[in-house]
Amino acid sequence: MMNWNTLISAKRFGLEEFHQERHENRSEFQRDYDRLVFSAPFRRLQNKTQVFPLPGSIFVHNRLTHSLEVSCVGRSLGTDVAKAILARQPELQNSYLPEIGSIVSAACLAHDLGNPPFGHSGERAISTFFSEGKGMALKEQLPAAQWEDLTHFEGNANAFRLLTHQFEGRRKGGFVLTYSTLASIVKYPFSSSLAGKKSKFGFFTTEEESFRRIAEELGMKRLNDDPLKYARHPLVYLVEAADDICYQMMDIEDAHKLKILTTGETQDLLLSYFPEERKAHMLKTLDFVSDVNEQIAYPVSYTHLRAHETLMNLV
């Protein structure tokens, strides 16, 4: 059984021996968020597409704007989940549990950092380079587990490496984020040998011990030793939910901006999420809005709320 008292830790990866609580204007988890925002890998997301190619004069979402929006939704979900847990377990009020919103927000900001250009197509291109292309020349020089990592390249595992690996000339611990933020981005807490047909896994062989250290410190449930596999950190589900809410809504909004969908088709898609009474109220409000983009932005924001309400009813 996992325990909230251990699952949320402000200990920083790579700075464990210097761990201390600072009583300043930001919590440790807000520091994680700020550290990511000001980083070069985060800025690089602006040139990575979300779904549609970057068309220039029409501003559709890219990975950077998507990550910012996911972090906002994640913060709201995390804050509400923390309130729900505290209502049932008030003894956790003086723990780090009220910080869940900040942790999820930071993890959401980092969730796409390891994705190559062109998303899943980019992952397949890298994998194919090693499994069928010139990269095959390296096969005999690598252990089987590392070769498996390369022939099933995974953006999520690459994000964990980017955040924790000590690159040439850089400090120990990578971004030196808190253990809880790092654990919250690992959707697939197992190695590539367990990836299966979907080729999904959470860390490369080179970072396996780093993940083990984090998981053991947080008291995450270990499901298997060799190959290594853990149960997810609970906050991963909130990061994943925020990501799903955003990309499904934003893809529809972008399709409208690019004139792939008409205004009527887009409104029908978005309004289908609502009961008839709420839908009638929204249509009445839309009668007062003449700007076409605003006619879509309004139901998009309400659809976020609808998804949020639905999730919170399950807590």
What are the language-model segments listed below?
Residues 1-25, 37-48, 57, 68, ...:
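Sequence-structural signature of the catalytic-core scaffold of metal-dependent phosphohydrolases
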Residues 303-310:
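Conserved small/polar residues in nucleotide/adenosyl-binding loops
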